Amino acid sequence: MSNEGQCPFNHANGGGTTNRDWWPNELRLDLLSQHSSKTDPLDPGFNYAEAFNSLDLDALRKDLAALMTDSQDWWPADFGHYGPLFVRMAWHSAGTYRMGDGRGGAGRGQQRFAPLNSWPDNVSLDKARRLLWPIKQKYGQKISWADLLILTGDVALTTMGFKTFGYAGGREDTWEPDRDVYWGSETTWLGGDLRYDKGGACESQHGGNAGRNLENPLAAVQMDLIYNPEGGPDGNPDPVAAAYDIREVFGRMAMNDEETVALIAGGHAFGKTHGAGPADNVGLEPEAAGLEQQGLGWKNSFGTGKGADTITSGLEVTWSDTPTQWGMGFFKNLFGYEWELTKSPAGAHQWVAKNAEPTIPHAHDPSKKLLPTMLTTDLSLRFDPVYEKISRHFMDNPDVFADAFARAWFKLTHRDMGPRARYLGPDVPTEELIWQDPIPAVDHVLTTRNVAPLKETILASGLSVAELVSTAWASASTFRGSDKRGGANGARIRLAPQKDWAVNEPARLAKVLKVLERIQGEFNSTQPGGKKISLADLIVLAGGAGIEQAAKRAGHDVVVPFAPGRMDASQEQTDAHSFAVLEPVADGFRNFVKGKFAVPAEALLIDKAQLLTLTAPQMTALVGGLRVLNVQTGDEKHGVFTDQPETLTVDFFRNLLDMATEWKPIAGEDTYEGRDRRTGELKWTGTRVDLVFGSNAVLRALSEVYASADGEAKFIRDFVAAWVKVMNLDRFDLACKKRWYIDASGLPGEPALSARIQWR
């Protein structure tokens, strides 16, 4: 396109210098408004579960199976079968998951968007998704891209002779890139220096190299990799050194050593890598490619640019002599040869079998045979002593290996979906797995008539409003919208490790739980017909009762909606190691920070709020309400800007915004003193999290709404709505929970238990 004779136009919408250019440390409140209805093209009433359940899954599987061998001239299938390509596609969709914060994974179909669609580790997966488009087009919104990517991998394995463990749908698409996922600080493709230069908070947690401390919550060795470089750490083709990184990154995605070996060896039973020529033949990634590429990228100028001339990783390895059929070829070759270092046609380090005959088929020329080859990370399974023992056991026991791979693959592709209650479809396995955070099925009923007497008993128990509300918050606020883990259901707050977390003040928590357990026991022992209440429900009900009491003290009659149906998990149903990652390093809602961090406390509050799926107004209402209710960790009264604590007022906002108060930092601390501007008398103390609601322009604007003369009634409604949202975040049994609100316009009276929760 010629620019000759054109007028300059440099002020396109969104262009120019942005606020973030001027103020790089600007608080990322935008993270609380992503994936809203404004970006969703589907109708407001669209119900994905209903759409998926109407899908003819058998017909879809048949169409996918037919695609596997329907090689297209524009992107020919290796060995005449797309199965290995689709296995890689599914693996890389799910494999971004990291258990540190639950982000990444396959659950939102993010492989379609930047940065994932343009990562160097995802070269050629643009073609895989484009091959799928006719099938996605045929079935429309009955299956999301997120579900289709994983189902295609499942079908690919099946068509290559492998029996999978099962498949569950239920992943709803998003329609824009995630903005909340921290992939690292590096600014170059495949950079890895900054993530290993963060100090003590980055220590290896999974038996990795103590000299390579990977920053949390990252689970990849380099920027834009799923895991670690297959050529070895920092280009060093050392299988033993590579094993350190493998153990670290797979551990961070919740895989143990056996699962790690099963996934690597099982995945490498199929297909090949691609490094037919030098990398400088490969063009720009999809996000940078020209419009004429129509969303594809990495245009290859080497030879035909496809088929035998494909360049992906730069490595040219085929692991098995049956690359489209499940078998033991990977282990047979791994242990059947000695290996010597060589280079691929692209110049990358890889390994070739010594004194071997050509037994490996050529991907596009049936008349040719190739020498067995391996990656540095493949040899880690032989030369790391722990991995070697597992690998030899698998090699000697093919059925054990097949079962281990099936289970590990299912875990890989479903780990970020949360509990089984979210699973859809006829292929959901019946076996309950510990990593699914199982909760017993509901075995009791509770009626509306039971609720009011229980509240009276709770309020007469001697527990304070702060104790009731704090315990309910501690139970429910473990929920993570990223991988749908945590929450109040299961009452795991009474179990290890949650009962011992510092943020939960174990001694105080034990006192509250003892009282609630007594109330539970007395109630259950006197009820006929199997009627009872779980501790999980009672904790939430008690929190609501505390809020009602606090509102009453402020002159408001409020009914906090309550939906029973939670159950109590056992310690045996709780993997303490897996749950340990849910321990908050900071909870700004309780003014808690576990230690010193490079990230300011207010940014950690935003991170917590985003994991709780809160909007900025919901976060603001909750912080203001919890402060005046004296919901704090520890004995400090930071942020309790009220003379009547445990009363639900707007005092937090009015006193924070009061210009009669002058704030000054306390030397050496992240806390502040608020003194009377005229007399110098100390009035309040607060943290960075408290003061940000008066300092940040957006949060101040929200605070002003509640601090206004007509703001109290709205604050009460908004606080109750946000509270009930958090209490019910893990209630996947409640219908149609896509977006919802609480109608608090007519609060007096005791409604049906869940009638006040309206879904939209």
Curated annotation (Swiss-Prot):
Q: Name one GO cellular component term.
A: cytosol
Among InterPro entries, the record links this protein to: Catalase_peroxidase, Haem_peroxidase, Haem_peroxidase_sf, Peroxidases_AS, Peroxidases_heam-ligand_BS
Q: Where is this cross-link: Tryptophyl-tyrosyl-methioninium (Tyr-Met) (with W-91)?
A: 227-253
The Gene Ontology biological process terms listed for this entry are: cellular response to hydrogen peroxide; hydrogen peroxide catabolic process
Q: What does the Swiss-Prot or TrEMBL cofactor note state?
A: Binds 1 heme b (iron(II)-protoporphyrin IX) group per dimer.
Cofactor dependence:
heme b
Q: Where is this site: Transition state stabilizer?
A: 88
Disulphide-bonded residues: none
Q: Which Gene Ontology MF annotations are present?
A: catalase activity; heme binding; metal ion binding
Cleaved signal peptide residues: none
At what sequence positions does the UniProt record place the cross-link Tryptophyl-tyrosyl-methioninium (Trp-Tyr) (with M-253)? 91-227
**UniProt keyword annotations, A-Z:** Heme, Hydrogen peroxide, Iron, Metal-binding, Oxidoreductase, Peroxidase
> What PROSITE patterns does this protein map onto?
PEROXIDASE_1, PEROXIDASE_2, PEROXIDASE_4
Give binding positions for heme b.
268
Lineage top rank: taxon: Bacteria
Subunit structure as annotated in this protein's UniProt entry: Homodimer or homotetramer.
Q: Which family does it belong to?
A: Belongs to the peroxidase family. Peroxidase/catalase subfamily.
Q: What does this protein do?
A: Bifunctional enzyme with both catalase and broad-spectrum peroxidase activity. Required for maintaining the normal activity of the TCA cycle.
* Protein name stated in the entry: Catalase-peroxidase
- What organism is recorded for this protein? Burkholderia cepacia
